[in-house]
């Protein structure tokens, strides 16, 4: 199976670590991975402030796989939010499955990720995030009240004011990208096949800023997504309006084959049941 990587940033200690967690493969990506990582972290850190951004394996690689997952740990539980922007695509292209932020910063702070270097810097010494990273090759995250704003447009709404909890004011993410694709001819052919399924995307094209990997620019692109979507598209973090495309196991299997993942039809067909069982068991532990 693929090597899977989590970038964990500890605000309290001012440290960062790249963690190899092969068990992520069992959860594919996106929302299931974000919840699995929380469950794993809570086993040894029951009270430490925790949040994460998690990508999917098709972000930045295939059309309409254009969203990311923000998870916020709250008292006796968690919330997940789906939104757009370049962040999930850049994460996946850099082979980072999840960006975990733990602890509380001593001062209002920014996180700066440049290539593989991670810095936690004093916000008051810098007027904005714009002085970090390369425009066009970075994603910026701003924490504003109960909204998280990615790339100055894409919203991830939350239940609480994150910056008041952990003193984090923003993130500049500008990694090196090195995602490996197998047969390039097969990839281009499959990409075009999915792109041509635009009529299956249940939203009207517009002239708004598009999510990364989507040509439609719909009126909902900047909104927090609150659609009730099946677990497989949530693991791939496709747009909810493209659920019909990424709920098709034959298409998903073909995409994984091109990207050299080892998932087979049996695994994909059983995935929803397995994740349902996992979520029920984890949620029971939160109720205790």
Pin down the residues of each PLM region.
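Intrinsically disordered, low-complexity segments enriched in small residues
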Residues: 1-82, 86-112, 118-288
């Amino acid at each position: 199976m693929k090597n899977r990587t989590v970038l964990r940033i500890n605000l309290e200690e001012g440290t960062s670590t790249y963690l190899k967690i092969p068990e992520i493969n069992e959860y594919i990506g996106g929302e299931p991975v974000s919840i699995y990582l929380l469950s794993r972290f809570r086993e040894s850190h029951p009270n430490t402030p925790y949040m994460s951004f998690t990508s999917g394996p098709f972000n930045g690689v295939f059309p309409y796989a254009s969203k990311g997952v923000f998870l916020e740990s709250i008292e006796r539980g968690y919330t997940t939010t789906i939104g757009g922007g370049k962040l999930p695509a850049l994460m996946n292209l850099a082979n980072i499955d999840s960006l975990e932020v733990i602890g509380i910063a001593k001062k209002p702070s920014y996180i700066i990720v440049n290539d593989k270097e991670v810095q936690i810097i004093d916000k008051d010494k810098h007027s904005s995030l714009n002085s970090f990273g390369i425009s066009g090759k970075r994603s910026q995250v701003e924490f504003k009240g109960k909204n998280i704003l990615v790339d100055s447009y894409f919203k991830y709404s939350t239940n609480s004011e994150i910056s008041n909890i952990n003193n984090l004011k923003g993130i500049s993410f500008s990694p090196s990208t090195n995602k490996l694709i197998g047969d390039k001819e097969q990839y281009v052919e499959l990409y075009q096949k999915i792109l041509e399924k635009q009529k299956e995307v249940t939203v009207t094209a517009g002239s708004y800023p598009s999510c990364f990997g989507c040509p439609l620019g719909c009126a909902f692109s900047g909104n927090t997504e609150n659609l009730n979507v099946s677990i497989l598209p949530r693991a791939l973090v496709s747009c909810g309006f493209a659920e019909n495309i990424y709920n098709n196991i034959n298409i998903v299997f073909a995409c994984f084959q091109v990207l050299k993942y080892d998932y087979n039809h049996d695994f994909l067909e059983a995935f929803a049941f397995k994740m349902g069982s996992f979520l029920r068991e984890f949620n029971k532990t939160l109720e205790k």
